[in-house]
Design a protein with these regions (language model features):
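Structured alpha/beta reader/binder surfaces that contact nucleic acids or chromatin modification marks
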Residues: 1-116
Length: 116
């Protein structure tokens, strides 16, 4: 099972309030795939270990979407109910080098596998 990092949203994953994630990569991901959420998957210092966040998640869908076309509902599903669409896009761009508001990203919808 592959790991997927949720470094920005570990609390939302722990609380199971996040059901959608946008990624620059992961374009070959298929519905039904099980993934293990982790806090950080890359850039670990010597001696650091991957920290799992709960149990696995199951991918429900993967769609190519334009970042700045995010809906208020998806901002909520991303785990940021307090943010506006513009605030989410700004935050996403800052955390993903080279990403622009009009960039195509992968929208991954998932469920928590132990509840499925």
């Amino acid at each position: 099972m592959r790991n997927m990092s949720f470094m920005i949203t570990p609390d939302q994953i722990r609380a199971k309030t996040k059901t959608v994630t946008r990624r620059m990569g992961w374009k070959n991901l298929k519905p039904g795939t099980l993934l293990q959420p982790v806090v950080k998957g890359q850039g670990l210092k010597k001696g650091e270990q991957v920290e799992k966040i709960g149990g696995p998640i199951r991918v429900l869908s993967v769609d190519r979407v334009i970042l700045n076309q995010i809906t208020p509902q998806d901002v909520y599903r991303e785990g940021f109910p307090q943010m506006t669409q513009r605030e989410f896009v700004t935050m996403f761009k800052k955390s993903h080098r080279g990403c622009r508001a009009g960039s195509a990203v992968n929208r991954i919808q998932f469920e928590y596998a132990e509840e499925a």
